[in-house]
A protein has these predicted regions:
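Gly/Pro-rich cap/lid or specificity-loop segments adjacent to the active site
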Residues: 8-239
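Alpha/beta-hydrolase fold active-site neighborhood
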Residues: 235-260
């Protein structure tokens, strides 16, 4: 463990830490020594000043995303739950691998991987995909389990997951249930067993209802959207966020049969 800094903000005492974890967990177990390429896992430990030296139970926050960094706090009220949580817990706020102050994955990372396979686009793309697979939920929770075992003496902790953190919660409970006292989620519980088709079959009728409500409120937009859809097959307009616009982007339910 490397202690990077200790400081206070109004109402909170914060420590910044970093540890090494394997880039690839295959062949390694959390809590044990490892070799090969490593990456950095950054995390913060947060308490109130009056509890700095108290033996509080641990709560780890499983951030949303995917690829989300932990909350950046200026006070106990910076994030809605921190004020109450720090009354009872020592709160751990990790940045997931690939995000925040942990070893990042960004466009520069992907460009370096592609450059290593210059001249063979397909091989470069496969190498990029293989690298990104090392940043999935199973690796994220193995990082956290390694953190629990090596830096917190193997003490069991409470988990709280937000959005994608709900998916991390179930992954944690599947792989390392013995390390968890209790789990809370504020959203993002995946379907069990996983079936994306069934999830979207429940989603589409709601989208249809919401679209109808929108057009009731803004009826003039119905003609505008219809006019845009007519032009899309031959249009060259490009959206900053999604690339070339198509009717499937504007209307992702086009061609979908939904039971009302």
């Amino acid at each position: 463990m490397t202690l990077l800094s200790k400081y206070y903000v109004p109402g909170l005492a914060i420590e910044d830490h970093s540890i090494d974890v394997p880039l690839a967990w295959s062949g390694h177990e959390p809590g044990q020594a490892f070799d090969g390429e490593t990456i950095k896992l950054f995390y913060r430990v947060v308490t109130t000043p009056e509890h700095v030296h108290d033996d509080l139970p641990l709560l780890i926050f499983l951030q949303g995303g995917p690829g989300g960094e932990g909350p950046r706090l200026n006070s106990p009220t910076s994030d809605g739950w921190i004020e109450e949580a720090t009354k009872h817990f020592r709160v751990i706020l990790p940045d997931q691998r690939g995000a925040g102050r942990s070893s990042r994955v960004d466009t520069h990372t992907m460009a370096r991987i592609a450059a290593a396979h210059e001249g063979d686009v397909a091989v470069g793309a496969r190498a990029q995909a293989d690298y990104l697979k090392k940043f999935l939920a199973d690796s994220i929770v193995r990082d956290f389990e390694h953190l629990r075992l090596t830096e917190f003496g193997g003490r069991k902790w409470v988990t709280m997951g937000q959005s994608y953190g709900g998916f991390l919660t179930l992954t944690t409970l599947s792989l390392f249930p013995a390390g968890v006292i209790a789990s809370f989620t504020t959203g993002g519980i995946p379907h069990v067993p996983a079936c994306a088709t069934e999830v979207y079959e429940h989603t589409f009728p709601r989208v249809i209802r919401k679209t109808a409500q929108f057009y009731e409120r803004y009826p003039q937009d119905k003609e505008r959207v219809a006019a845009i859809v007519e032009k899309l097959p031959t249009a060259a307009e490009v959206s900053e966020f999604v690339g070339k616009l198509t009717d499937s982007v504007l209307n992702p339910m086009a061609g979908t049969e939904v039971e009302h």
